[in-house]
Design a protein with these regions (language model features):
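Polar low-complexity intrinsically disordered regions
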Residues: 1-2, 80
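Metalloprotease/metallohydrolase-associated module, dominated by Zn2+-dependent proteases
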Residues: 2-74, 90-147
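Active-site recognition of the HExxH zinc-binding catalytic motif
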Residues: 77-90
């Protein structure tokens, strides 16, 4: 395929694309329910803004439900955008808003743990995009160096 998918022909094509991006973005441990929504059949608004995709996230259980409206632009791009909402930095931002800890401590934890994890996941994902013949098991080798 030479270009991103604008409109999915079948539910299987949609699910296959979602699974491909979930794998390439390193979201293996997330349980995600993907729904392809026909245009104008579901309320796709957030704060009075019409959206091409909506993600309902449970960070604690690493579960998400992602609704994607078919044929509202580059639908494959919407899939990637919605999946990126699952990256760890959003967890830290939520905890910053909800705790009484000193902001310096939260920022240190955010910088040292969450951002590092996010960058590592993204780096692996982009390597897999560049080298499509590898999968996530390729990175299991690096864990041997830490044992």
């Amino acid at each position: 395929m030479a270009e991103p998918i604008i409109e999915f022909e079948t539910e299987k094509e949609f699910i296959d694309c979602c699974k491909w991006w979930k794998d390439k973005l390193g979201l293996w441990d997330w349980m995600i329910k993907f729904n392809l929504v026909a245009p104008n059949t579901k309320d796709m608004t957030i704060n009075n803004t019409v959206c091409a995709g909506i993600t309902d996230i449970n960070f604690i259980n690493k579960q998400a439900k992602i609704d994607i409206e078919n044929n509202v632009g580059v639908t494959e791009l919407t899939i990637v955008h919605e999946l990126l909402h699952l990256f760890p930095q959003f967890i830290a931002l939520e905890s910053m808003a909800q705790t009484g800890e000193q902001i310096e401590e939260l920022l240190d934890r955010f910088k040292d743990n969450i951002i590092h994890q996010s960058l590592e996941s993204m780096a692996k994902a982009f390597i897999m995009v560049k080298y499509p013949n590898i999968d996530r098991s390729f990175f299991d080798i690096e864990m041997q160096y830490w044992d």
